[in-house]
A protein has these predicted regions:
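Structural microenvironment flanking redox-active thiols in thiol-disulfide oxidoreductases
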Residues: 74-111, 121-127
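A short beta-strand-turn-helix
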Residues: 41-61
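Hydrophobic beta-strand core positions in alpha/beta domains
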Residues: 62-64, 94, 139
Length: 168
């Protein structure tokens, strides 16, 4: 009886965990790379917050697309907040695709998110960048050129990532 129960638990874990490793993030596919191209200019407002990319020229920008229901986004958020505190010279712009403003606000409160955030439920900005997976982050240099696209929830404290950010 106990071995049958243990086997059932293992099967359940395999059904839940395996897809996470196979599909990584909340990604549904890939679009052509925009690396090396000028980042699309955008201005987005959700009635409470707004972001205009042109206001960040001259700064290194991490443009992060996320959703409150996305597991990897939940894992990544504390690291982005920590990076924001350690590197105030970086502009970390977080664009949520949440349709529910309540879920968006609860997420921000739960994780004490003090990044520049905006809710874009129609995914207008995500579509401009060819984003269809979450989390997805574009690293944009001081001249507005996309230098790297990061899909999933990387370790933002990784020395290689930190060194790359220093070069921009």
């Amino acid at each position: 009886m106990r071995s049958t129960r243990l086997l059932s638990v293992r099967r359940l874990l395999a059904l839940v965990v395996l897809p996470i490793f196979l599909f990584g993030g909340c990604n549904r596919g890939a679009k052509p790379s925009q690396i090396g191209k000028k980042a699309p200019d955008f201005s987005v407002s959700d009635g409470t917050h707004s972001i205009n990319l042109a206001n960040y020229r001259g700064k290194v920008v991490l443009l992060n697309f996320w959703a409150s229901w996305c597991g990897p986004c939940i894992q990544e958020t504390p690291a982005l907040v920590e990076l924001h505190h350690e590197r105030p010279d970086l502009a970390i712009l977080a664009v949520s695709i949440d349709e529910d403003p309540g879920a968006y606000q609860r997420f921000l409160n739960r994780f004490h998110v003090d990044l520049t955030t905006v809710r874009d439920p129609n995914q207008t900005v995500a579509k401009m960048f060819g984003t269809d997976g979450w989390p997805e982050t574009y690293i944009i240099d001081r001249n507005g050129i996309i230098r790297r696209k990061v899909v999933g929830d990387p370790d933002w404290s990784n020395p290689e990532i930190r060194a790359f950010l220093q070069t921009l």
